Amino acid sequence: MELKVINQQGQAVESLQAAETLFGREYNEALVHQVVTAYLANARAGNRAQKDRSEINKSTKKPFRQKGTGRARAGRASSPLWRGGGKVFPNSPDENFSHKVNRKMFRAGMAAILSELLRSDRLVIIDDIKVDSPKTKEFAAKAKALGLENALVITGELDENLYLSSRNLSNVLVIEASQADPYSLVRFDKVVVTRDAVKQFEEQWA
């Protein structure tokens, strides 16, 4: 299939032959949801922690005698029933949040996302995008001219000037093709991909 390629001024300059399997796939919402949630789950650090009753720093002495007080019996102050006591099922930093997605499903999910972006006019193919110096003002002007208010920019290889000039913009993210992930693709309003990045996508996922 043919993709329209624009230049940095937003003008159509040529067409690019691209794989139908990558940009012409039907949208599979369940698969895309699975791929995105698996990516987010695998990115979790797993650093939350709570204490159980054995880890609470309280006396192990019985708070009061077993009978004769009229109160419910109690064994120790670290009981989960008491304020300040341990959790019954505490969260652990060793908890495993990872979801397994095999390579075939991941490739199909990425292709479904790219195809849907193209159908909904959210995917822009550009011949190349560069800035002369690492200045946010220069990149912001270029992004505004291309209508990129909330955009993911994917290049074949990361240009240092482009990266440095864009990292101060909260609504724009510049990455190289090898760093592309399903969450970033669905998160932004526009996805700008260079010709070189398209070729890399075809090698990885087509």
Curated annotation (Swiss-Prot):
The keyword RNA-binding is annotated on this UniProt entry: yes
Basic residues bias (residue ranges): 59-74
Annotated Pfam families: Ribosomal_L4
Keywords: Ribonucleoprotein, Ribosomal protein, RNA-binding, rRNA-binding
GO biological process per UniProt: translation
GO cellular component: ribonucleoprotein complex; ribosome
Stored InterPro entries: Ribosomal_uL4 (IPR002136), Ribosomal_uL4-like (IPR013005), Ribosomal_uL4_dom_sf (IPR023574)
Basic and acidic residues: bias regions: 49-58
S-S bonds: none
Coiled-coil parts of chain: none
Family of the protein in this entry: Belongs to the universal ribosomal protein uL4 family.
Assembly and interaction partners: Part of the 50S ribosomal subunit.
Record's function text: One of the primary rRNA binding proteins, this protein initially binds near the 5'-end of the 23S rRNA. It is important during the early stages of 50S assembly. It makes multiple contacts with different domains of the 23S rRNA in the assembled 50S subunit and ribosome. Forms part of the polypeptide exit tunnel.
Name listed for the protein in its UniProt record: Large ribosomal subunit protein uL4
Organism the protein comes from: Laribacter hongkongensis (strain HLHK9)
Gene: rplD
